[in-house]
A protein has these predicted regions:
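Cysteine-centered catalytic environments shared across enzyme families
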Residues: 1-147
Length: 147
C-alpha cells in the first residue's frame, strides 16, 4: 500500500518519515509538507510534478480519459485546466483512491466519489496532519482516543 502524508508541522513530518523509513517505504515525492510513498511490492508511478505543482495518488485507480489509464500527467493537466478541473477528474477517475493536488500553493485532497478509500486527519493548535493510516494521526497528535 502506498502512503500519502501532509502536515504543516515539521516535527510531525520527521516523526512520520522515521516510521515510514523503518517500514522501508520508498519516497516518490516530498515538498511543501506533502510526501508520497510508493507501493512496496508493485512498481507503479503515483506522483507527477513540474514547476507549477504536483499530483499524487494512492490506492487502486484508472483514468477513463486517456488511451493510457494510468497516465498521471493527463490527470494533472486536466486538474489544471479551466475547462475540466477537480469535478471532471473525479467523474473520470475510477477505483478506490486518495488524490492530493497542489497548484498555486493551494493543496486539495479528495478520495473516490464512493468514499471507499480512508483518509484520516487531525487539526489542532500544533498543526494539521492528513494521512491514510490512523495510527500515524494518533502518533503525532498526542490525543486520547477511545479503544
Amino acid at each position: 500500500m502506498g502512503k500519502l502524508l501532509f502536515t504543516n508541522n515539521q516535527d510531525w513530518e520527521n516523526i512520520l518519515r522515521g516510521i515510514y523509513s523503518k517500514n522501508e517505504l520508498n519516497k516518490n515525492y516530498s515538498s511543501n509538507g506533502l510526501t508520497c510513498y510508493a507501493k512496496r511490492y508493485v512498481d507503479s508511478e503515483n506522483c507527477y510534478f513540474d514547476n507549477d505543482g504536483v499530483v499524487a495518488i494512492i490506492g487502486t485507480w484508472a483514468y477513463l480519459n486517456d488511451d493510457n489509464p494510468f497516465n498521471l500527467n493527463v490527470i494533472y493537466q486536466d486538474l489544471k485546466s479551466e475547462d475540466k478541473g477537480v469535478d471532471y477528474v473525479r467523474k473520470h477517475l475510477i477505483g478506490s483512491y486518495a488524490l492530493a493536488y497542489i497548484q498555486d500553493n493551494k493543496l486539495r485532497i479528495f478520495v473516490d466519489e464512493c468514499h471507499t478509500y480512508a483518509l484520516y486527519y487531525y487539526i489542532g493548535r500544533e498543526g494539521v496532519v492528513v494521512t491514510n493510516t490512523y495510527y500515524h494521526v494518533e502518533k503525532v497528535s498526542k490525543q486520547e482516543f477511545d479503544e
